[in-house]
Amino acid sequence: MVNQNIRRKFRKRTMRRLNTYKLKFLVIFLVVFATTGIFISFFVGTSSVLQSVEKFNSEYNVEDGIFITNDDIDEKFKDISLEQIKNGEVREGGSTVRIFQSRKKINKYQVTSGRDIQNDKEILIDNNYLKANKLALNDELTFNGEKLKIVGTAISPDYITTKNSNLVLQANSEVFGIAFVNEETFQRLFGNEFSSYYAYTSNLDVQEVSKIVKPTYINDSQNNTRIQQVIGDAKAPRDLALLLTCLLYLIVGVLLSVYHFEVSKKESNNLATFNKLGFNKWILFKHYIAETSLTLLIAWLIGGTIGIFLIETIMQMNSQIYNYPILKIDYTLLTECLVFSLAIVLVINFVLVYQFYIKFKKKKNKVKSIRKRSSKIMKFIPFTYRYRLKRINRNKKEMALFIVLIFFVGLLINFSFLLKDSVTNYVDDLASENIFEEILFLNPPNQHDIKGEEFKLYNLHDEDGITQSVYVIGSDSKYYNYNLKLADGDVIITQAFSDKYGKKVGDKLLLKDVTNQKDYSFKINKVNNVTTVSNIYLVSDNGEMFNHETYSVPAVALSNPYDNANDSGIEATLTRNEIITSGKNILDVINKQITLILGLAIVLQVALLYSLLEFSYQNSIKSIKTLKLEGYSLKELMRMHFAFSFPIAVLTIIGSYLLSRIGVRVFLDQIMFDFVNFVRVTDNLNIIFASNGMIIAVFTFFLIRIRSKMKCI
């Protein structure tokens, strides 16, 4: 047993260490606080979104695919469940509302606010369209002469990403929305003038389904960006948060190691005395673990609390581009993360305390024999630099720690800048690459003469089962030539397609029409400069590149907005403005995420560089005092202890830049690799100067601070 007097003295020693190393504890506190907050808010928030969406898809029976057929399907197929999806579009004042008849089995809608439809004078619309167009529940809308009351908002699994077309990256709720009405209302609105397709659920793959239902067109849900995009956009930030958390816990371990190494070094004589006096290991363990455990616990409590309050904000962060179903926090995961986040830092601390204090052994000073090594090269290096090189060689762990911390901070900063600049360039390129004003997708049986550039759009599968957009254009195309001289028979891919799939001029393209089980092979002879979409362009003046049974959508590109009141032959429209604003919407979301990551990176770089340089300075005090007494100037002392730090830091940041480029590519591909849209990672070298500048500026500030402290020794 330890008497009360000893306990009081131990408490005083603990408080003295807290006061002496208060800045180090502040650094540890900030890193643990940030780590816990990010883990709880981002990981739990994004995981909860993913779980809510997947549960919604399951409960409301998301499709496994869709198909179009010219035949009425009455028979029931084995292993396939079907439902006809009916929709019509109302276009007024540049805005389009796609109205669906309520579904009974597949892609059923969920009412997210208000109430469900009760009569044929009511309508449900999606929440984002409601907000973007400044509407409210109980407002009335007039569609095709029918007044309908908005009684609620709703969304279905196939339209969480509520975008007009798969050709755009993100939704634009100001100009496009969806709505649901009952069967009677739908009949009054559209009569027989509506579009339809079949949604199906099945465990069979798309080719097997195609053989059974014999459609004119078929596509599976894996290639439906309206379904997959929201899932990818939840998974990528979740995985990023998990990776970031793991790296931050590594930093926590490093900071605790630095602290315990420094304290145990100063406490070596006291530890030897305590052992001789008979203090058992448990008493010493409790004594030396007290201040760090207290710091970790407070940081965990505050970080966890703030993280919990931020979960809802994180969950709704992408709500402006996705019409989410009702989202619920995964409280089981939250509890597990809270327990794990506390356990991991305490375990790290316990292990380090045991390693540095309990396994303590008094090191005996051994006189090492000096072996003189002659080096002709070293003789030409000034003594101050030779001394620095010797210190680096003898303190390899210190230099390794410096490189790791600089690399980690550089990784965060470069990742943020690269992601922001890449998406910004993507938005700018959307404006320059899309020079048409509007595209009209026509309903083949009801085509009427529209003046514009005609082309056909095919959706065919590649070797990996990914749907590719194939445009059949004329050699006189002005909207799709992209500064190339087109010739009949050209097979052209975009630069984005080349970057994504590694294809180049001379390579073969293998495409499959799963509807008719037709295989097509083409040899690429040109690559255009388009970087925003991974499209294929086939040039044919007679429009014949595929078997006549292969399904295509005829379309017309216009130089001016279509303002003809007669739109009976138009299946859907896509404006240039929709394409551009879809990119701007995602840029807004990316900017919010980047602001958070950059803020974290700046706090970390200040905290880590301070901790690292302070650690290096404390380990150098004896040599600095000795060398100062021998007459070395302050400038020489700085060289002897901190030379080569700047070039090493610069090279490390460049290395982190190269890895960040890979990280951004992986991050973007995880969200949208299967989509036609493509965001190219920027080649802007100014990012290297910006990230280097930020870190070098902070590093210089702390070096000046240490220089002033060396003056006073």
PLM segments and residue spans:
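N-terminal Sec/SRP start-transfer signal
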Residues: 1-37, 289, 293, 369-410, ...
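C-terminal transmembrane helical bundles of large multi-pass transporters
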Residues: 570-669, 673-680, 693, 697, ...
